């Protein structure tokens, strides 16, 4: 019996004392001992064999204190974490909305700059060409200023200096040639006719784009695209018939500008100029600008001569400071609006860019009419409106792809 008692020494009755408090609202170990003692003692007195082993195990199990209840502090921390997670998700959503709003505002600012630079370029350019009828000199100055800006951006690191091979330069050369001719023909037209009329004729760019793509690339347009060209051609014809400043030199110069600019787009697809990582659209435009300057400068020297000098301007009775300042501003706006155009193209789809370009043409036409007080008849306005509506329709239909034929 003593050995049995020794085996259950763990369940000897404790001296009478207050139960041990584990915490607020918790139980003590004393009630468990009072219930465990009679049960264990009864088992021990009945047998010394396997029952004794079971009794010892039972005694150990019954002596374990109950698990402490969840502290109110822990529960509060859990609720706090849940609230914090919800708040973090709400903050992330708010930051995403703010980021989207910031991008929208940035894009709107770029469109505004694109239109503003274009307006000032056309105004200053027309003012200079009106009194200084040497478009090759003016175009050369514009390319020269663009070259200086491009070199400055490369040297200062504003624009990453491109790594370009001789083969790439050779492939870009045809693009530079047609780019040079396109801007030269535009300036020739602006010197002969009103700004509004030049831009009305240039609304026919989609017509030449479809024509040249079909001839050289084999890209046949859909019926809807062809139908959208009808109001463009009809509107330009109607505006030309009623244009007060119409002359054939200005008309054909603007048409030649359309052909050369759209040839540039076709050539870029035909030659498939491969761009390295450092040769983005702005770098490509900068390289073309530099090449255009070196292409046109000898032509200006051999044809018109170097006319844009203080001596020549003064002998012609012109305000030297005014002509040179406006020429410089026109050149800066010329380079700036084209760079901003490429920045917009990197952020939006080509269709959105095309629609923006159509709106830009409307803004330039209206602004030039108001600034220069160009006489415009109702029929002339109607023709311009029809042509621009056709351009907008063309840009919308161009994104529609024909459904594949079922096998």
UniProtKB/Swiss-Prot annotation:
It comes from Oryza sativa subsp. japonica (Rice). One of its GO terms (molecular function) is triose-phosphate:phosphate antiporter activity. Residues 1-51 form a transit peptide. Belongs to the TPT transporter family. PPT (TC 2.A.7.9) subfamily. The gene is PPT2. This is Phosphoenolpyruvate/phosphate translocator 2, chloroplastic. GO terms for biological process: phosphoenolpyruvate transport; triose phosphate transmembrane transport. It comes from the Eukaryota. Residues 123-240 form the EamA domain. One of its GO terms (cellular component) is Golgi apparatus.
């Amino acid at each position: 019996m003593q050995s049995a008692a020794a085996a259950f020494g763990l369940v000897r009755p404790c001296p009478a004392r207050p139960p041990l408090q584990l915490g607020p609202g918790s139980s003590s170990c004393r009630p468990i001992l009072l219930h465990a003692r009679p049960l264990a003692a009864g088992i021990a007195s009945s047998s010394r064999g396997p029952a004794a082993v079971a009794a010892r195990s039972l005694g150990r199990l019954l002596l374990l204190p109950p698990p402490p209840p969840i502290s109110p502090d822990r529960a509060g921390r859990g609720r706090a974490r849940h609230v914090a997670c919800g708040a973090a998700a709400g903050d992330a959503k708010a930051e995403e909305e703010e980021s989207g709003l910031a991008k929208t505002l940035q894009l709107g600012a770029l469109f505004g700059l694109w239109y503003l630079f274009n307006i000032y370029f056309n105004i200053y350019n027309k003012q200079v060409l009106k009194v200084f009828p040497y478009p090759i000199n003016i175009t050369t100055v514009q390319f020269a200023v663009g070259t200086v800006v491009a070199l400055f951006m490369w040297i200062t690191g504003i624009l990453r200096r491109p790594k370009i091979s001789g083969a790439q330069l050779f492939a870009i050369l045809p693009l530079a040639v047609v780019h040079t001719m396109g801007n030269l023909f535009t300036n020739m037209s602006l010197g002969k006719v009103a700004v509004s009329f030049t831009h009305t004729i240039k609304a026919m760019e989609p017509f030449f784009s479809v024509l040249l793509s079909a001839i050289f690339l084999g890209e046949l347009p859909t019926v809807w695209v062809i139908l959208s060209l009808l109001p463009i051609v009809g509107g330009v014809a109607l505006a030309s018939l009623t244009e007060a400043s119409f002359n054939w030199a200005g008309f054909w110069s603007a048409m030649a500008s359309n052909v050369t600019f759209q040839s540039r787009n076709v050539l870029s697809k035909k030659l498939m100029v491969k761009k390295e990582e450092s040769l983005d659209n702005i770098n490509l435009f900068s390289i073309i600008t530099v090449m255009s300057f070196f292409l046109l400068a000898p032509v200006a020297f051999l044809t018109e001569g170097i006319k844009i000098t203080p001596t020549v301007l003064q002998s012609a009775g012109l305000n030297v400071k005014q002509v040179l300042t406006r020429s410089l501003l026109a050149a800066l706006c010329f380079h700036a609006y084209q760079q901003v155009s490429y920045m917009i193209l990197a952020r939006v789809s080509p269709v959105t860019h095309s629609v923006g370009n159509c709106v830009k043409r409307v803004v330039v036409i209206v602004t030039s009419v108001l600034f220069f007080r160009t006489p415009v008849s109702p029929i002339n306005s109607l023709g311009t409106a029809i042509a621009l509506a056709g351009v907008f329709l063309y840009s919308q239909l161009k994104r529609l792809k024909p459904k594949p034929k079922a096998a």
